[in-house]
């Protein structure tokens, strides 16, 4: 298994400097990760640096709270795609989901999906640590209904990250044709393999190099 091609090599800390982002880009070239996942302000740089390399440019929308308006999320999506993003990880409106406003949640996702159509993959972050199992299932069902390419566990900025149990539940809910991304707290090769075994088709990690090299020390970041 080429585990590197399942990893979004991630740097999303608010205090990340250009040198931190460049380090991630260079590592992505070296190890041929699926993508680099960076904050929107770095998308143009990453797209320029990764031109000609088989590494996608992934960024985040409505991040990390998901509480932006739909119009803002749509604007962000169009803006980052224009700057070179080929994958976007959007955060759902968690409060609306908890209120049972499924129509709003689906519309919020669908409008981002439509803004990205044919230009970028859309991964929907449901923030599993804040949800009941019933809400996790509902969030996944609404994501599929809205046309998302992936569902994703976590931002890495809330109270918890990916668990194998959540991945299994998400995979069971979305079926075989929608991706499932495990993110938050995946720090070692063993962590990554557990997630893949449970049904993950993508891993979000900042410890990507340690995972590929099977370096047990891993990393300490939540993401």
UniProtKB/Swiss-Prot annotation:
GO molecular function list: deoxyribose-phosphate aldolase activity
SMART domains per UniProt: DeoC
GO terms under biological process: 2-deoxyribose 1-phosphate catabolic process; carbohydrate catabolic process; deoxyribonucleotide catabolic process
Family membership noted in the UniProt record: Belongs to the DeoC/FbaB aldolase family. DeoC type 1 subfamily.
Pathway the protein acts in: Carbohydrate degradation; 2-deoxy-D-ribose 1-phosphate degradation; D-glyceraldehyde 3-phosphate and acetaldehyde from 2-deoxy-alpha-D-ribose 1-phosphate: step 2/2
Subcellular location per the Swiss-Prot or TrEMBL entry: Cytoplasm
Protein known as: Deoxyribose-phosphate aldolase
Positions of the catalytic residues: 89 (proton donor/acceptor), 152 (schiff-base intermediate with acetaldehyde), 181 (proton donor/acceptor)
This protein's record includes keyword Heme: no
Lineage: Bacteria, Bacillati, Bacillota, Bacilli, Bacillales
A Pfam family it matches: DeoC
InterPro entries attached to this UniProt entry: Aldolase_TIM (IPR013785), DeoC (IPR011343), DeoC/FbaB/LacD_aldolase (IPR002915), DeoC_typeI (IPR028581)
Matching HAMAP family: DeoC_type1
The keyword Ribosomal protein belongs to this UniProt entry's keyword annotation: no
Function according to Swiss-Prot or TrEMBL: Catalyzes a reversible aldol reaction between acetaldehyde and D-glyceraldehyde 3-phosphate to generate 2-deoxy-D-ribose 5-phosphate.
GO annotation, cellular component aspect: cytoplasm
Reaction catalysis annotation: 2-deoxy-D-ribose 5-phosphate = D-glyceraldehyde 3-phosphate + acetaldehyde
Main location: cytoplasm
Enzyme nomenclature, EC number: 4.1.2.4
Coiled coil: none
Organism domain of life: Bacteria
SUPFAM superfamilies cross-referenced by the UniProt entry: Aldolase
Keywords: Cytoplasm, Lyase, Schiff base
